[in-house]
Amino acid sequence: MKIHYYGHSCFGLEIGSSFLLFDPFISQNPLSDPTLLDTLNPQYILISHGHFDHIADASPIAKRTQAPILSNFEITLWLEKQGLSQVLPMNLGGNRSFDFGKIHYVQAAHSSSLPDGSYGGTAGGFIVEGPEGILYYAGDTALMSDMKLFGECFQIDIALLPIGGTFTMGVDEAIRAAHLLNCKQVMGVHFDTFEAIKIDHEEAKKKFQDEEIPFRLLKVKESLIL
C-alpha cells in the first residue's frame, strides 16, 4: 500500500492495482496544489461525510474520470441528484468487496450536512482491508470508545486521524485514539488548513514520540509506503 497526501483530509491510496481517493478537497484548499484536480485518476472516490472540506471536488473528479463514489446513503442520493449516476451507497456497519479487498464504513462522532444545507446522513470513517495491510481513516471525529472495538476487530497497520482540534480531535485525543486502536502507526490529517486547526508540528511529533507511537505528518504531494 502507498499513501499520497493532498492536504487537509484528502489522500490517495494505492492498493493492489487500484487507486482510491478520499475526501477530495483541493480547489478550495489554499495549501493544496490545484493542478491535482485535473491529474488525479482514481478508480474509486470515498467520502466520509458531507461537509464542504471533504466533498468539494468529488463531483468534478467523478465526472471527469467516471470513478464510482462510495459514501453513506444520503450523500450518494444527493450526488445522484447532482447528475452522478456512478454511486455505491453504504451505511454504518456495512462493507463492500472489491478486487483489492474490502471497504468497511464505520462510525465517527461528528456532524454531517451537505454544501447546500441538505441532510448528509451520519458521518463515518473507512477501514480498507486487503492482503497488503489494513488502513483506518477516521474521517472527522471526536475520540470515541468505538475505536477500541475497531482495534479488536482489525489489526490496523496505519490510522489516519484528525489532529487539528476545534472541529475534531486534537493531538492529545489522537494519541488516546491510537492506544484504543492498537495501530502500528498514525498519520495526522485535518490540520493547518484553516486558522482554527493550526498545530505545532514539533510539539505534536514529540507527544507521539513520548508515547512510543510512530507518527507521520506528510507535506502536500508527499507519499508514504507501507
UniProtKB/Swiss-Prot annotation:
Q: What is the lineage of its organism?
A: Bacteria, Pseudomonadati, Verrucomicrobiota, Methylacidiphilae, Methylacidiphilales
Keyword list (alphabetical) reads: Hydrolase
Query: What InterPro entries does the record point to?
Result: Metallo-B-lactamas, RibonucZ/Hydroxyglut_hydro, UPF0173, UPF0173_UPF0282_UlaG_hydrolase
| Listed GO MF terms | hydrolase activity
One protein family per Pfam? Lactamase_B_2
Keyword hit for Transmembrane helix: no
Q: Which organism is it from?
A: Methylacidiphilum infernorum (isolate V4) (Methylokorus infernorum (strain V4))
What does the sequence similarity comment in the record state about its family? Belongs to the UPF0173 family.
Looking at the keywords, is Transcription regulation present? no
Its recorded name reads: UPF0173 metal-dependent hydrolase Minf_0129
